[in-house]
């Protein structure tokens, strides 16, 4: 086991604080409408330019192991805030730095760290409750647009796109962010259920000008196995031909003579057919086939439940108003499924989202909800260079998470004002069990001014003057650093999602409280590589002596 380096008391805390400040100072320059960018060097490729707090935090690793421990703990604050609300990472870092600095001053003055932490926890709990009281619902498109604009670093086009996307696909719909091909940002909305499987043969194409297959009022045959024998399909094909409607086959695969016969029948015009592979893999494939069945009022032909393809009838087939297939995607528009059954299926998937612990599974389940509930919107980010594209994509992603958080828990006045107001409201009535807890309460409430002060500092103004003016105001009165004007923050469109502000404060206080109560730090002693190299060199010289 490697030897350890151990530091105690003030020695440990000074080192830890240095690490906290290095990381927080790098992150906090990005805060607010006039926040600056940070350039991150990469081991390969061009450097990344970002204004996203968590991206900056993740890149920082310090040489001194004790300082690095402090930095890593603040990195955890930014990371947790990002996981919970998708935004507010810089605010969380600034709050953590302020609480740690104030708290360690009190510890150095001889206060009991445990009582300080209890005081901080009381203050945070009271302020979180007050934030809920100050919060107002975020319902109108205008408010959604304002939240998106602020979070995308005052980029109003991004705010508009997110607002339009939410209008089109609903607040629960899936909105994804992709690289665009031009200089402008674009919004692409796919209505109906789309999945990433294209036609199995180009001979199915009936619209050569767009290289797509379009089927009007088709039947849908859903099968959870491979089809290679055409005999299994004959009864269904005959029934569909009599009905005079087209047929879409969605199966694990269609191959061999079955695919060849379908192509020949289509080309001769005997029956209009197209075939695609079922989306997903394994259990997810079965679940998605079931989703399509509910959407189109069909049945999945599965041997697991004792159904055979040869015995399938028209009653087992789903129906939709229209299906469009290209080489990569299949879109089912207006399935005839029962509304109540679709809602029941959506509720069931939502329950699975609640119970799931994997982010990947949650994302896939959320996509299934959106496909059942009405559509998917894609924001295509345009930029002149790849470096700008990455930076912009980060901002659009943040804005998207912020608007979702706003819809979920409502909005409060932005620009750091909500925390200042909530802190002022609870300050008079909040008391600890002893004097040291009172000091903890006061330092936590004082630290809640830090985001406002940092926004003002980044805008090149005097933080103390603005903070004093904002504290003397009432309600949503605050300072718009973008226009350098005082006024009602909500009327000026400076909004923050309540969830983002709340998460930032809770995670910052949680980690900062632990750091204040630290008395000892243990790390591995650095290996003395020079000594090892010296020994190796001496051995080599000895060998040369022998040769002479």
Swiss-Prot record:
Signal peptide: none annotated. PROSITE patterns: CHAPERONINS_CPN60. GO terms for cellular component: cytoplasm. GO terms for biological process: protein refolding. It is found in: Cytoplasm. Forms a cylinder of 14 subunits composed of two heptameric rings stacked back-to-back. Interacts with the co-chaperonin GroES. Together with its co-chaperonin GroES, plays an essential role in assisting protein folding. The GroEL-GroES system forms a nano-cage that allows encapsulation of the non-native substrate proteins and provides a physical environment optimized to promote and accelerate protein folding. This is Chaperonin GroEL. It comes from Haemophilus influenzae (strain PittGG). The gene is groEL.
